[in-house]
Amino acid sequence: MAHVITNLCMHDGSCMEVCPVECIVPGKPVEEWPSYYIDPETCIDCGACVPECPYEAIFMEDEVPSDYEAYGDERMSMPEGTEGFDEEFESEDVDGVVWVLKATRVLDEGEVVDLTPAIQRNEDYFVEGPGYDALD
């Protein structure tokens, strides 16, 4: 069972720096794939990425919450054009690269959201999306 990066990810990249098997890839193009993604076939479930994420966006696959209760002020990102996600968020990753996420929104304190769609989206990134080619 792999770890999953959810839509709470704001493209920081700290997780990628600590992964011992280099299975974490930044989403590109960011308009379509706004998070970082973990290859479920390569992830060894070491958990090194979890404490590194400043957005607390990483969960074990079987622990991704379907009823995540926001503490307030955290953001969710979605592919550009997703209804209700119309705020831009500028993020600088650990390498100093600036990413502009064009489809985000701030969660209200106590708001409950389902983060489980990230499980399939994470897998799709490596099957249908760019996967490791995004590193080129």
Predicted regions and their residues:
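A structural motif detector for beta-strand N-caps
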Residues: V18-C19, C23, E52-C53
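Ferredoxin-like iron-sulfur electron-transfer modules
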Residues: M1-D12, E22-D45, M60-E69, D133-D136
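Flanking helices and flexible, charged tails adjoining ferredoxin-like Fe-S electron-transfer domains
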Residues: E41-T42, A48-D136
